[in-house]
Amino acid sequence: MSAATVILILLMLLGILGRSNVIAAAAAFLLLLQFTSLQRFYPILERRALEAGLIFLVVSVLVPFASGRVAPRDMLQSFVSLPGLIAIASGIIATHMNCQGLELLQRFPQMMIGMVIGSIIGVAFFGGIPVGPLMAGGIAALLVHLMAWLR
């Protein structure tokens, strides 16, 4: 059994233990590709899977607008109310942090294991909800930049 297979099995098990279905499913999918000798698709997935995933994420967020469940008046409230302005600022900060997290994970993919373990600890002992590696990566990137700045 290759080291890559062991790592994917470990990630899948950690995802299951940490109740992170996304990590468990992604690791299982890659294991399936590996066991069926379809690794030739890895470069395509590496280039395009994140983009495809983000499209599905944005589609799921836009469905309430497309279905008419969010009225134009409600949308305008987000531009003139304090909670709405805070939500806009939070979205800007979160997306910037997610971008930093993605860049960090692309440079240091080995950090994923630590983030998954941290998610498991957060769920098991602090009542957390595993939301995915980008936000954890964003926070890690912020802390890495802070440590570099403090040196």
From Swiss-Prot:
The keyword Phosphoprotein belongs to this UniProt entry's keyword annotation: no
UniProt keyword annotations, A-Z = Cell membrane, Membrane, Transmembrane, Transmembrane helix
Spell out the InterPro entries in the cross-references.
UPF0756_TM
Compartments where found? Cell membrane
Q: What is its main location?
A: membrane
**TM spans (from-to):** 6-26, 52-72, 75-95, 111-131
Looking at the UniProt record for this protein, which Gene Ontology cellular component terms does it annotate, in alphabetical order?
plasma membrane
Q: How does it sit in the membrane?
A: Multi-pass membrane protein
Q: Which family does it belong to?
A: Belongs to the UPF0756 family.
The protein, known as = UPF0756 membrane protein Moth_0120
